[in-house]
Amino acid sequence: MQINELVTFAADVGRGLLESGAETSRVEDTVERIIRHFYDGKSEVLVVMTGLFVTVGDVTKTVRVRRRTINPVSYTHLFL
């Protein structure tokens, strides 16, 4: 897998997780694991609620996330 493809794939997975309501720490961990599986060099991942930044080698991709959903099943215990 080429570095550009890896960065795009990892960022797309991160976007999907954030849009699905995943915690930022879980998104960051997942994206880092994907990158480490395919690339041994230096990489950086930063995830915030509204986007993520993925750098692998000299390639950086920034993704803004505008749409987020929350799975109501996971929060039902708050209302019981």
Map each language-model feature to its residues:
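N-terminal, Lys/Arg- and Ser/Thr-rich interaction peptides
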Residues: M1-F9
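Catalytic cores of large soluble enzymes that bind and process phosphate-bearing ligands
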Residues: Q2, E19, E23, V73-S74
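Short Lys/Arg-enriched alpha/beta "domain-start" segment
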Residues: F9, G14-A22
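Divalent-cation
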Residues: E23-V47
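Alpha-helical transmembrane segments and immediately membrane-proximal extracytoplasmic
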Residues: H37, G41, T62-Y75
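Short acidic-glycine loop/turn motifs at beta-strand connectors
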Residues: V56-K61
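Conserved small/polar residues in nucleotide/adenosyl-binding loops
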Residues: T76-L80
